[in-house]
């Protein structure tokens, strides 16, 4: 009987040693606390951010729209739905036309369209400049969004569907649409 109790105590002791608690360290040099278990809601290594193009910038916030269309018409929703988010707390160097990935604050997102969130981190996704091009992609997008065609379309939330550069004609073609629109504007931007 004594052997069974000792064996049971050893098993309990071994099992309790297997449990782990987060290891917390305090760095006295910078007064910060870190944990061996990252915050999966805030750590961008564990969460994809919202990827899209910056299409508007006003009042210290930017509107980012995603070019991938979703069809929710089978459930009574939009046939041409494009995700869009207004972000506050964005660095001042973020400009219209840039392709970005934005990580939002946990729980700050709203359900309205476009959504609203506070940016925790923003990364500009660099696109290579095509051989022979004078402009970079973000400059061509900025010119397209400022064009009279886009102004005439009166898009509240423009979406950059696609960007192409034609080296033989030395021009960019920017395809622009918006939520609920099947129609896509084809904006030509001279490479100057």
Regions found by a protein language model. Name each.
Residues 13-17:
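C-terminal motif of bacterial Sec signal peptides marking the signal peptidase cleavage site
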Residues 59-67:
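Short aromatic-glycine-enriched beta-strand elements
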């Amino acid at each position: 009987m004594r052997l069974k109790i000792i064996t049971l105590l050893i098993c309990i002791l071994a099992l309790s040693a297997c449990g782990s608690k987060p290891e917390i360290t305090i760095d006295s040099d910078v007064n910060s606390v870190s944990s061996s278990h990252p915050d999966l809601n805030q750590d961008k290594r564990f969460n994809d951010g919202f990827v899209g193009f910056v299409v508007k910038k006003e009042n210290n916030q930017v509107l980012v729209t995603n070019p991938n269309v979703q069809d929710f018409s089978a459930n009574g929703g939009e046939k041409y739905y494009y995700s869009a988010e207004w972000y506050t707390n964005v660095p001042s160097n973020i400009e219209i036309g840039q392709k970005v990935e934005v990580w939002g604050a946990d729980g700050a997102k709203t359900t309205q369209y476009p959504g609203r969130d506070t940016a925790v981190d923003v990364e500009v996704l660099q696109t290579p400049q095509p051989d022979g091009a004078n402009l970079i992609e973000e400059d061509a997008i900025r010119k397209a969004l400022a064009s009279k065609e886009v102004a005439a379309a009166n898009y509240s939330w423009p979406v950059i569907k696609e960007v192409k550069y034609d080296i033989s004609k030395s021009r960019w073609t920017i395809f622009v649409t918006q939520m609920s629109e099947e129609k896509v504007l084809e904006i030509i931007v001279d490479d100057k």
